[in-house]
Amino acid sequence: MSRSLVKRVAPYLAGRIRENHRLLNFSSASAIKEASSSSSSQPESSSNDVVHLSDNCIRRMKELQSSEPEKKMLRLGVETGGCSGFQYKFELDNRTNPDDRVFEKNGVKLVVDNVSYDLVKGATIDYEEELIRAAFVVAVNPSAVGGCSCKSSFMVKL
């Protein structure tokens, strides 16, 4: 990843981190609850504000949930790294945090933290099975340009 891209993206990410840090530093739990509910109760204005789940993703999550006594959610995060600058991180989780956004389709929940959400809104999450691997992937991401063939890293569209 070029240093110039990092220099252009860093101020944006730093601003988002500061904004989320202020949200998490409210002095009372009720303030956190109020702030998170007001941001999540706003109507979704378009399909680009939602993170979509493919039928394959839903099928695989239901398979995983059937073997667990407690239904887990799929958590998507974005971290720096990978061959293109940012990489997707998928985990199974049973908890949400105050700064999470939750998307649900057919009983399957996807959880995305607010900082990562800005980099994946409008994206479609899929589950791909190939000869050498099977994994959750971000199949389409309108916020990304470029990326690597493994589909786990990307560059941010500025």
Curated annotation (Swiss-Prot):
One of its GO terms (molecular function) is metal ion binding. It comes from the Eukaryota. SUPFAM superfamilies: HesB-like domain (SSF89360). Binds 2 iron ions per dimer. The dimer may bind additional iron ions. Keywords: Iron, Iron-sulfur, Metal-binding, Mitochondrion, Transit peptide. Pfam families: Fe-S_biosyn. Fe cation binds at residues 83, 148, 150. GO terms for biological process: iron-sulfur cluster assembly. GO terms for cellular component: mitochondrion. Residues 1-26 form a transit peptide. Its cofactor is Fe cation. Its main location: mitochondrion. It is found in: Mitochondrion. Involved in the assembly of mitochondrial iron-sulfur proteins. Probably involved in the binding of an intermediate of Fe/S cluster assembly. Belongs to the HesB/IscA family. PANTHER family: IRON-SULFUR CLUSTER ASSEMBLY 2 HOMOLOG, MITOCHONDRIAL. Homodimer; may form tetramers and higher multimers. This is Iron-sulfur assembly protein IscA-like 2, mitochondrial. It comes from Arabidopsis thaliana (Mouse-ear cress).
